[in-house]
Amino acid sequence: MKCLNNSDIEKELQRLGRTYLTGDLKNFTDLNYIKTSGLEIGISKYEEFKYDKAHLHKWNNEYNYVLEGEIKVYIFSEAKEYHFKKGDLFNIEPNMAYMTKSIAGTDILFVKSPGGNDKSLIDISDNNQFLEWTKSWEEKMI
């Protein structure tokens, strides 16, 4: 049997704000994660308001379950903002460009399948509306 204990998970979340619990990881982590292929599971913890840079995943389906707090997700291809709260689940499909912002106290459990580092950043530096959206929770996309 393989397992991870809460104190090790919490220590890594305090250090980085995000940790992978399972996967075949290439990036450095102090957590002795459970090595798997075909699936990655992790947690993101946002102690304060934060936005994640615009990006897409080339081949991963990403499922996100809101454990605590709230998150807004902007999907570029739909030109639409979604608002998710505690208990909500949402799926980001492969090649779906998006950006997120979370209020303080938000925790997300994420699952990526089939796994692997496929993140590709999207440059929004020339779009003032997108940049303004990332600065505050209240800012809405028109």
Question: Where are each of the predicted segments found?
Answer:
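A generic structural signal for short beta-strands and their flanking turns/coil linkers
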Residues: 37-42, 52, 61-62, 67-69, ...
